[in-house]
Amino acid sequence: MANVAIASSVLGLALTIGSCSGGAEPFDRAAMLGSLGQTVILPTYRDFAARAGELETATSTLCGGPSEATLASARDVYAATREVYARAEAFAIGPHTDSPRRLSPKVNFWPVRADLVEEQIAATTSIDLDATSSSARGLPAIGYLLFGLDGGAAEDAAIVAALEGRRCEYLRALTAYQKARADEYVLAWSPDGDDFAGQLAEGRGTFASVQASAGVVFEQLVFTTENVRELKIGKPFGKRDGGVLQLGEQEDRLGGRSLADAHANVRSVQNVWTGRYADVQGIGVRDWLLARRPALEPEVAAAFDAVHAAFDALGDQTLDQAIAEDPEGVEAVYQAVKDLQTVLAVDVAQALAVTVTFNPTDGD
């Protein structure tokens, strides 16, 4: 399933936003949106581009001298790249989902199809990732080549031994492709590119108004928490299939980052909520709430704290390990994210006079 969020049909006036007591809105939503673009969104994508460049370098080093040490280094950079990309989930709109760029299926379509990756490696034609299946060209495909299917020391030795010829050519192509897509995210949001940040702040282009822009930003916070709960934790945990575990339906099972990515998604929500990223404080959705119903803010803060505590209690376990060895802990994460989703979708939405619409990933 692609890591998708809002489709273009939702980005107009697919939601209703009211004003305070029928009067003028006492909060400058355009200033909030402009701040989020410059303080949170663009810096996150710039960091993603930087990490993607480091991943390209690390895999080139790995292919130039395959060893357990260079493999471990490439894996570390892969994890760092996934971490920062996961922290962009709360603004997975516009160029992420919409044509002509529609970057999401090019970067993080999951789960990976190992058989399709192997077909590409076995092929004799030139590598054309634009024409390759989404399930064989994204970050999960890189994870497959770096981690294999089974893990363990024997698998690591086999991975190192196989890193030559077309396999390395494909790995290099994948990481170069991801660096190009990361740069494309930056260009799409930048004033010297598509200026999607400007469209968002000014309520133009894709957006019908500043009201619509602000509503879309808030909706994405709700959708992200719902997707973490339902798709990234709940589905593998058997919450959507009558108790049947769906361990293969993880975002990054092979790289062991499914839990970490889900937690990073929540941190992404919190970054937009607070308007803060990398120690730079801007204006966030929390400020909008403080202008309308400040008494509710501590409840939201407590909900975020509960989610972080539940994730932290699982330590460094993979989702497979946690489900097998600490299902109560996984349940605690699921419930904490559900509580956060509820306070956002019900209490905060009511306070902001925003009607949350249909989540386009619901039912996937």
Where are the model-predicted features located?
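Ser/Thr-rich, Pro/Gly/Ala-heavy low-complexity intrinsically disordered linkers and tails
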Residues: 21-23
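Bacterial N-terminal signal peptides that target proteins for export
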Residues: 1-9
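Mature extracytoplasmic or organellar-lumen-exposed domains after removal of signal/transit peptides
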Residues: 25-364
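C-terminal motif of bacterial Sec signal peptides marking the signal peptidase cleavage site
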Residues: 16-19
